[in-house]
Amino acid sequence: MGSSSFLVLMVSLALVTLVAVEGVKKGIEKAGVCPADNVRCFKSDPPQCHTDQDCLGERKCCYLHCGFKCVIPVKELEEGGNKDEDVSRP
């Protein structure tokens, strides 16, 4: 293998690695949407998650009740939120 072929191979591998790492950093968003949150907060709680990948199963990382937490997503956001469902319980 010539030195120019080796250089092209190394540059290609570096680019593929950078693209893959960026995809992992951004994370894959899970299905569903975060429930409506109509709570006004004076102080935010410490985050329990940062991305959907931090949450187990189908749960999503959503800002709800003054902080980011893993919650069960809703299929679509209803006007006024889902008042009948307590989605913050594990």
UniProtKB/Swiss-Prot annotation:
WAP domain boundaries: 27-74
SMART domains referenced in this protein's UniProt entry, alphabetically: WAP
GO biological process: antibacterial humoral response; innate immune response
Chief location: secreted
UniProt cross-references to PROSITE patterns, sorted A to Z: WAP
Region forming the signal peptide: 1-23
An MF annotation (GO) of this entry: serine-type endopeptidase inhibitor activity
One cellular component term from this protein's GO annotations in UniProt: extracellular space
Entry keyword Ribosomal protein: no
Disulphide bonds in the chain: 34-62, 41-66, 49-61, 55-70
Localisation per UniProt entry: Secreted
Keywords: Antibiotic, Antimicrobial, Disulfide bond, Protease inhibitor, Secreted, Serine protease inhibitor, Signal
PANTHER family in UniProt: WAP FOUR-DISULFIDE CORE DOMAIN PROTEIN 12, WHEY ACDIC PROTEIN WAP
Role: Antibacterial protein. Putative acid-stable proteinase inhibitor.
Protein name in UniProt: WAP four-disulfide core domain protein 12
